[in-house]
Amino acid sequence: MFIESFRVESPKVRYGAGEIESEYRYDTTELVHESHDGASKWVVRPKSVNYHFKTNTTVPKLGVMLVGWGGNNGSTLMAGVIANREGISWATKDKVQQANYFGSLTQASTIRVGSYNGEEIYAPFKSLLPMVNPDDLVFGGWDISSMNLADAMTRAKVLDIDLQKQLRPYMESMCPLPGIYDPDFIAANQGSRANNVIKGTKKEQMEQVIKDIREFKEKNKVDKVVVLWTANTERYSNVSVGLNDTTENLLASVDKNEAEISPSTLYAIACVMEGVPFINGSPQNTFVPGLIDLAIKNDCLIGGDDFKSGQTKMKSVLVDFLVGAGIKPTSIVSYNHLGNNDGMNLSAPQTFRSKEISKSNVVDDMVSSNAILYEPGEHPDHVVVIKYVPYVGDSKRAMDEYTSEIFMGGKSTIVLHNTCEDSLLRAPIILDLVLLAELSTRIQLKAEGEDKLHSFHPVATILSYLTKAPLVPPGTPVVNALAKQRAMLENIMRACVGLAPENNMILEYK
């Protein structure tokens, strides 16, 4: 059964004017390694910590600024939001299609809230806490190409022609601001697009981004802004002492116009200095140590890295299943070919390396979770190949072969073919990242014994479900298994309204 909304009634939950407060008991464990008389043992002790959550329920007018607004992802997202807002329908070869937000966790998925008369009851994910309606978002952004959003949509070749014709009047007046362009960080083949760039030194470019954010906020009268990088994958930046290892060194390097400070890092610095959340949707190491340090000092949300949309999402499910079932993956070979601008940029070895790292690390935590299957240091052979094939356009082909060891020396091979409509999968993920980042800034919490409420850690692990290479605070375990990531996100939101985590025990029927 499906219900549109619900209200929690509990002595530990209070709905006030503009806020929800909850008292929540967090049940976990602590491990102790004890030694007695030369013998050692592990002891697991149940542990409970009481938390107080406070969520601001006033939904702001939210502005979204995309770096790479005129790219395939940006133009597709813009088109989708307009089509939903205006209730547009269009003819395909199969049917008359209605606009929707399929593929969005916040807009098109559900959560279980309990059971009624023996039937499980589900409600929209977005009903847990008040969120910004995507139809109300105000968009803007930067691009190194001056092409307006209507022409960018046509260039992308993602959406049906009938839909494009209906959207053109809404989008042809939308033009991106000049963007930061450094040909050393992306493929040389992107130079032909770069006719709309911010001139000057790196410091001047960063200051222009700050100015752009302020003017966008003032012009559109928005309460908050979230900035998201959906531009080209950059090569990895060098990280070294004295260059970008601390906030002081990073800012000094910007002042000195150091060549190794990437455009994405400049955007991120500008956002952090303005107190604006910044999300990195590409695989490069935007968040160098000095930038993470700056975000923590300024208590400004940062999140990333790299949208998790197609092949990697499948991998994070399948490997989790195999290892959890006691099956040992020994070889994972992933092949992709695509023909959009992302594929053209990734045809350069230095930018492909960033993507290869992001895609390859996704199974690490699952492998390390099972020492029965894997010896220390042992890891599946894992190869990732990406090729540029212009004809297939945005319709990326992903082919995977998983070879595993099974019972008594047997071998199992699974082969998958996945046609990933790249931008149509990524656009709703961008939407979720923006909405959840904004929501995160309205949640405060404190553990028992702490003096005052505080925000989540600025490094937003809550966004991990949506990214290939989750950015986590120093010393925090990295979790890539998709089911764990979704459970973490959902259960934190449940805690904000005093609901227990969804553990699927269903003891009332046992």
Swiss-Prot record:
Q: What does this protein do?
A: Key enzyme in myo-inositol biosynthesis pathway that catalyzes the conversion of glucose 6-phosphate to 1-myo-inositol 1-phosphate in a NAD-dependent manner.
Where it mainly occurs, coarsely classed, is cytoplasm
Name the UniProt record assigns to this protein: Inositol-3-phosphate synthase
Q: Where in the cell is it found?
A: Cytoplasm, Cytosol; Nucleus
Give the GO molecular function terms: inositol-3-phosphate synthase activity
User: What is an annotated GO biological process for this record, any one?
Assistant: inositol biosynthetic process
Residues annotated as binding NAD(+) are 70-73, 143, 180, 190, 193, 230-233, 281-282, 306, 309, 340-342, 355, 393-394, 422-423
Species for this entry? Hordeum vulgare (Barley)
Q: What is its EC number?
A: 5.5.1.4
Which Pfam families does the record associate with it? Inos-1-P_synth, NAD_binding_5
**Domain of life of the organism encoding this protein:** Eukaryota
Q: Name one GO cellular component term.
A: nucleus
InterPro entries, per database record: Myo-inos-1-P_Synthase, Myo-inos-1-P_Synthase_GAPDH, NAD(P)-bd_dom_sf
**What is its cofactor?**
NAD(+)
Q: What family name appears in the similarity comment?
A: Belongs to the myo-inositol 1-phosphate synthase family.
Keywords from the UniProt entry: Cytoplasm, Inositol biosynthesis, Isomerase, Lipid biosynthesis, Lipid metabolism, NAD, Nucleus, Phospholipid biosynthesis, Phospholipid metabolism
Tell me what reaction this enzyme catalyses.
D-glucose 6-phosphate = 1D-myo-inositol 3-phosphate
Query: Which parts form a coiled-coil structure per UniProt?
Result: none
Q: Which PANTHER family does UniProt cross-reference here?
A: MYO-INOSITOL-1 PHOSPHATE SYNTHASE
Which enzyme class, named as a word?
Answer: isomerase
Q: Which pathway or pathways does this protein act in?
A: Polyol metabolism; myo-inositol biosynthesis; myo-inositol from D-glucose 6-phosphate: step 1/2
